[in-house]
Amino acid sequence: MYAVLKSFGLRGLNGFPVEVEADISGGMPALSIVGLPDSAVRESGDRVHAALKNLGFKWPDRRITINLAPADVRKTGPVYDLPLLLAVLAASGQLETPPKDTAFLGELALDGSLRPVSGVLPMALEAAASGVRALYVPAENAAEAAEAGGSEMQVFPAATARQVVDALRGVQPIPPTAPVPFDPADAWNHVPDFSDVCSQPLARRAMVIAAAGGHNVLLIGAPGTGKSMLARRLPGILPPLSREEAVETTKIYSIAGQMPAGRGLVTARPFRSPHHSASSAALAGGGALFRPGECSLANCGVLFLDELPEFSRESLEVLRQPLEDGCITVSRAAGSATYPSRFQLVAAMNPCKCGYYGHPTRACTCSPSAVRQYRSRVSGPLLDRIDLCVEMDPVAFDELHSVSPSESSAELRRQVLAARAIQAQRYAAPGYEGVHCNAQLTAGQVRRICRMTPAAEQLLRASYETLGLSARAHDRILRVARTVADLAGKRLLDEDSLLEALQYRAQEKVELTF
């Protein structure tokens, strides 16, 4: 006898349909799984066998052949356990073959209970696009899968395979799961507040500019000056995630297996802070299953690299593609996968190896050549992709004990949202597709958008020739100046906007001369 069920697999960031075919024929009792299965899929036969018996069903004592189509695409993971069990039941006559518009996902425990699987949201989105009307998933994945449902597709949560069988037989229907209400603004309540940061007005201003324009930031300062505090508070003044951004971010976290059980969409902008010992593969992603790395996990959020020069040169060079293109391609012998990596980079570093070069009270123990060598670990091409650089001085005692309140995240966020509203209106015009903030402007768009007063243009010309700026640095200065002007509500870039943008140039602050 023969039966076919519908399931889905993962290829990069997207799902693809998989037909689970089961054929039971005469011959010696055996189970064969074909269709390019990996070891986890091949092992599913043993899980299905044990679960089926423990649920009280009969295992067919005949030859069973399972085919996962299309046969030329590799199948990975335990997501096919549930459809395999149902296909065996249908082919052996213990269950009617489910309708063609019904699909199944889920890993089996040996007692027949269902365990959550990774990548449910991209597979559920593909299911809805493929015309599936009913999707059965493990109960812990239901909230995530329901985000792809709506009126066209219902998502049914199940704790055991027995519940799925009873629902298909009409014995005990399963109530469908409704999507969780989307409330990204609530995420602000779980981020530390900027009012905790004492003094550092220049660095605070740089973080506001970064949030308003989507710019990358480098913080340079001795230990204890507040670099990490500022970085961890940046998500609290960023605009809330749009639903489109939330879906994209949730897909990445789901594929990486980092979605908490029972969660719908990710509502908070990610904040990722990998250790400086992280390898290039940890940042870029990879492995046999093409898992996303830290660059992709920080998509639509903040990637914080503390102790920047301590990262290996190979790891830092990985950042160049996502910083420029907003995506990263992971290539292996089995193929390649491209993941979105549109993050804001916030990097922090000490001024030297000992951390006290230029400190007003503590002596630096590094020689000039040691300072130069330490800072040279950050390459020029990477610095050229950082829009804002701030040197942070130690906090004075009086500032630490000042009773004057610092601006809160809510106050800074109002400034950021006002500037983002100006940009949203500006980039709603034709010709700016995919541009949401000033940092995303192309070179051609910079020329059209960043109009200057005559005095500002003369200042930029003098700076370009004196500082020996590259074309990329020229455009980044204009993007920052455009953000400064947006924060001030100015239509044209004036001298003040350009001067503030120029003072944040990273190249000159990192490359010391003695």
Language model features with spans:
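Catalytic P-loop NTPase motifs of RecA-like helicase/translocase cores
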Residues: 111, 305-312, 355
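Conserved alpha-helical scaffold flanking the Walker A/P-loop in AAA+ ATPase domains
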Residues: 208, 265, 270, 280-303, ...
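Walker B catalytic acidic pair
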Residues: 300, 306-307, 318
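Basic, amphipathic alpha-helical bundle interface domains used for macromolecular binding and assembly
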Residues: 34-45, 60, 67-77, 289-290, ...
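Peripheral, non-AAA+ core regions of ATP-driven protein-machinery
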Residues: 1-218, 222, 228, 331, ...
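Walker A/P-loop
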Residues: 219-260
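Conserved inter-motif catalytic segment of the P-loop NTP-binding fold
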Residues: 245-279, 286-287, 393, 434-444, ...
